[in-house]
Amino acid sequence: MAKILLVEDEINIASFIERGLKEFGHTVTVCHDGNAGWKILQDEPFDLLILDIIMPKINGLELCRLYRQRFGYQSPVIMLTALGTTEDIVKGLDAGADDYLTKPFGMMELVSRIRAVLRRTSKKEEDDTYVLG
């Protein structure tokens, strides 16, 4: 399954997500602020990033932008946040997110979205290999 970086400042929500994703076989690394998330991304690759937006130090939008500038699109990003207006969603997607999920959410919906973005990423890699290979 996937190696996931979860950056979520609310400890209860982070624990809920971590437990749920581990039940589905994913490996989850948790950071509680954007600065800690950015530091770990310098040293370790992940299959997927799940980012809250409202966080101390570096918010999720800025972390997504930094990640895209440094690493491009090597891993998909899902924004997971309480901010749910159309304007918020547009900001998240414009920052480089591949998907956007608002709180409250169900674990099955999150897992389904993870599968979907990983399928799209896998399909793109296959297409790139076919075209380039």
Language-model-derived ranges and their functions:
Residues 15-23:
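Charged docking surfaces used in two-component/phosphorelay signaling
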Residues 14, 56, 85, 103:
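The feature encodes the CheY-like receiver
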Residues 8:
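Conserved acidic carboxylate
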Residues 33-36, 59-63:
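Acidic catalytic/metal-coordinating carboxylates
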Residues 49, 53-54, 83:
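The short loop immediately C-terminal to the conserved phospho-acceptor aspartate in CheY-like receiver
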Residues 3, 116-133:
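Short, Lys/Arg-enriched segments at the junction into DNA-binding effector domains
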Residues 25-32, 40:
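Short hydrophobic/Thr-rich beta-strand motif most characteristic of the beta2 strand and flanking loop
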